[in-house]
Amino acid sequence: MAAALVGVSMVAAGTLAGVGPAAANAPGHPGTPSAPRTVFTEGFENGEGAAVTPLPDYTGAAPQGQTYAADPAWLTSCNGLLVSQQAPASPPAGVNCGGFWAANKQMAAALGTWAGGDAATNHSLTAYTSGNPGAGRTELETVRPIPLSAANRFLAFSVDAAAQNCFTNHPLLAFYLLDGGAARAAFSSPIDPCQNPGQVIGGTSVGTYASNGSVLFSGDSAGIRLVNEQASGNGNDGAIDNVRLLDATPQLDQAFAPARLPVGAPTTLTFTITNTSELAAKNGWSFTAQLPAGLRLDGGSAATSCGSGTATADAANGTVTVHGDLAAGQQDCTATVQLTSITGGTYQVCGSAITDAVGVDLPGCASVTFTAPVFDARSHGVRLTSPLLDIGPLAPSAHSCTPLPGEDDHSVLSAGLGSVGTLGALTTDASGTIGADGSRTAAAHARTAGVNLLGGLITADLVGTSAQARQPLTDNGPGAITLTGATTLTNLRVAGVAVAADAAPNTTIGLPLVGSLVINQQTPIAAGKGITVTALSLTLLTGVHVTIAQSTAALLTTTDPCPAS
């Protein structure tokens, strides 16, 4: 049939490209129409040979085994006959074809040539009116319902038609799709092969004609009715072949752009509704998309280019609902909505998330990845390193190497550091939190009581630290990181001398013949994305290093290395 579709002319619609048993629109090709799927076709060839068969006596091919009816006016006076070029030279008795029998055979042969088949054996339904049939009479109607794959499908039709004697009254073929007892027009004007031939073969005008409209069926079966609007029997001579019922349901696709971005930054979810290749009008389709938890819709951002359609975003429920139309000749249209997420991760939307789909084929999957800052919150009560022995970290707490919120805390009652000294209770915690506004905070705390080092050279009732890294969320993603760090000193004494509770950061005290002590040590880390605060950092000449009450807080990117504890 492909050859027949080149140069097809249209009355009822634009040309029908690629009609055949091709698959319906497949997801993944937004904006590129695919051929409509053939639901039913009748070529009037089942069991036919040289003999002439009246339309009511014909049964179509299995599994449908379709039969046909017509108004009496279209079953008499040389009408309603299945004819081929190989039919007998004389018409069957009682068909009243007079001297026009050969013309019936010529039209069947011309339709066979047009379709790229065998002109001699091709059968067509012919009508060479030798009387006035009257307007609006049914020339062909399916008797058995044609099953559909599902409800809420757009249906269209296609037919090969021929006509002779175009100098007088033309056949005017009006096709209807039957929805239960209702006949629904799938055209804007009747097919007139005389006025719009795809080709003239031996004096016979022929063409393939597709509906420029479509019918949205809610049921699971359909029928076809051909009504000839020409009342006169003067002229009105024609034939039809290759009647097709087409599932011309548009394809829905969905895509995110950009598909990878920071949390808080907006991405656009685009729904593309792509017509089938006959480009008939598709009015009244609709669907609702349910987005996964974690995505935040911009309720005022929904928009559509789909005719007089509407697009609405329900931010509270995470749904997008679209109603729209495709005009005749329109390849596609779109609906868009903006959204974001304050939680890092990959979110996928698939066809299973589309509910209340009417007149669209479900899409494939689309995904978007939001990259989130990574929490790095760590603390410990004490750690000792030396050339011979390491102790700790003791009472370590950590919430690190994850974009997800969480917390950790630990404590011990006391700690011994060998010849270096003793400590009382150690308590620590570390956490990562996400605010309702999307801001992220990494925080850590450490407290060490009962400090007694180097035989009383360094003592304190309590030392503690806190570290925090906070990052707000802006309309374009994570903002600048704010770092804070503090040290608590209660009755700290070094060599019997009291140290101010508000000692400045990185206060260093030399310990002659012993080493040095840094108080309220504050060190930026991760290229300024974090801070480490240590209450007491003791370095001995023997190579021993002790950190007491240390807290670290940072907000890292996904490309930063995961920190050691």
Language-model segments: what does each one mean?
Residues S77-A151:
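Surface-exposed, low-complexity/disordered Ser/Thr/Gly/Pro/Asn-rich loops and linkers
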Residues L178-P193, S286-T321:
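A surface/secretory-pathway sequence property marking extracellular, secreted
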Residues G136-T138, E229-A248, G359, H545:
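Extracellular carbohydrate recognition
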Residues T371-S565:
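Extended, solvent-exposed, non-transmembrane regions
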Residues A26-K105:
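Extracellular carbohydrate-recognition regions
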Residues V263-N283:
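Short beta-strand elements of extracellular/lumenal beta-sandwich folds
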Residues A182-F217:
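Extracellular carbohydrate recognition and processing domains
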Residues T138-P145, V206-G213, H323-T346:
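Low-complexity, intrinsically disordered segments enriched in Ser/Thr together with acidic residues
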